[in-house]
Amino acid sequence: MKPGIHPKYAIITANCTCGNVIKVNSTAGKDLHLDVCGACHPFYTGTQKVVDTGGRIDKFNKRFAVLAKK
């Protein structure tokens, strides 16, 4: 590696709104604020919900049920 051309890595803290603190290596050099992380994201915690506005999923299933039968 050539000296003097590579960015310096620093250990920074990524703070999540849930209170989780993650230490990572970064070239940014400043701390990060996260809205979601692996500890509070609905997909990873198993609390994922399907939001159906106006019965759109039911309408879709009715429309394409004919094609599924073929």
Curated annotation (Swiss-Prot):
- A single MF term (Gene Ontology): rRNA binding
* Chain sites annotated for binding Zn(2+): C16, C18, C37, C40
Which cystines does this chain contain?
A: none
Write out the entry's keywords from A to Z: Metal-binding, Ribonucleoprotein, Ribosomal protein, RNA-binding, rRNA-binding, Zinc
Query: Which SUPFAM superfamilies does the UniProt record give?
Result: L28p-like (SSF143800)
Instruction: Please name the PROSITE patterns in this protein's record.
Output: RIBOSOMAL_L31
Q: What does it do?
A: Binds the 23S rRNA.
The record's similarity note reads: Belongs to the bacterial ribosomal protein bL31 family. Type A subfamily.
**What's this protein's name?**
Large ribosomal subunit protein bL31
